[in-house]
């Protein structure tokens, strides 16, 4: 049995539970208990505060955990990064009142900064030879300048709407963060085998996230040019049609290049282009 620690609420909780669901792992409700066992996979889920997850994994109370990179770096616990998961992305930034003229990071010299991430902040300030008074608070960091507690803040930024609603502006992006799968350094061989199975499922889901399955009818006269346009995993699938002048072409495309490639396909005479999402992809 492998024990995974995950955040008990919030955006990372939702993203993590969605990932586990997409891997086919069934997890019961967490509303009444902190530890839930899967009904179809050797996994039990331990629900914790996000800032407790790194230590819980490092100490071996949990074997692995899914946690924000910001918390992992801040806690500096002795655990391995098993995989970057690419979701729950945010950044940790310095922000100050909108009305303030900001010349650069030297503005913070002698100022007070409120934050829940003092260790990351101290490293950044030391790298930039800036001396400040760091005021550590947990939660509602964004209100600190408005109530006179600090001159600026160092906090998580996602959309930036919280800063705007508190009359603040982002002036320095210090760190980019995403969800990480972290692991204890001393897993048994049995638990490593379960983790490998879990990783196989997770990677199959993540790889498919930005891919589209595309089918089209293509004129055989332009088939060579169409095949060159399609990146594909290896080469596209070509299927004959009743009309000998045409064939059906199937391929997998990266979503970020999708519209550019579709435009080229249409210019080469492709018709009836059908696009479907991919739930999982096993390479």
Task: Walk through the language-model features, giving the residues of each.
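Small-molecule-sensing regulatory modules
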Residues: 1-43, 69-80, 84-91, 99-283
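Active-site-flanking structural segment that lines cofactor/substrate pockets
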Residues: 37-55
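Pocket-flanking alpha-helical
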Residues: 51-56, 61-78
């Amino acid at each position: 049995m492998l024990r995974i620690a995950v955040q008990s609420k919030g955006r990372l909780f939702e993203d993590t539970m969605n990932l586990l669901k997409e891997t086919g792992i069934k997890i019961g409700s967490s509303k009444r208990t902190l530890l839930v066992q899967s009904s179809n996979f050797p996994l039990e889920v331990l629900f914790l505060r996000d800032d407790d997850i790194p230590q819980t994994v490092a100490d071996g109370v949990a074997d692995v955990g899914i946690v924000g990179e910001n918390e992992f770096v801040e806690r500096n616990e002795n655990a391995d990064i098993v995989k970057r998961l690419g979701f729950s992305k945010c950044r940790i930034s310095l922000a100050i009142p909108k009305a303030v003229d900001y010349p650069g990071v030297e503005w913070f010299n002698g100022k007070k900064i409120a934050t829940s991430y003092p260790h990351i902040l101290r490293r950044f300030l030391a790298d930039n030879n800036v001396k400040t008074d760091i005021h550590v608070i947990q939660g509602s960091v964004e209100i600190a300048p408005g109530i006179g507690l600090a001159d600026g803040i160092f906090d998580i930024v996602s959309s930036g709407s919280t800063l705007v609603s508190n009359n603040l502006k982002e002036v320095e992006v210090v760190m980019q963060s995403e969800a990480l799968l972290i692991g204890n350094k001393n897993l048994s061989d049995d638990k490593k085998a379960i983790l490998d199975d879990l990783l196989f499922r997770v990677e199959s889901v993540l790889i498919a996230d930005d891919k589209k399955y595309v089918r089209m009818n293509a004129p055989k006269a332009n088939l060579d040019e169409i095949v060159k346009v399609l990146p594909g995993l290896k080469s596209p699938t070509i299927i004959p049609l009743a009309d000998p002048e045409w064939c059906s072409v199937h391929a997998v495309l990266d979503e970020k290049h999708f519209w550019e490639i579709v435009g080229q396909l249409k210019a080469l005479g492709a018709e009836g282009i059908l696009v479907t999402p991919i739930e999982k992809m096993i390479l």
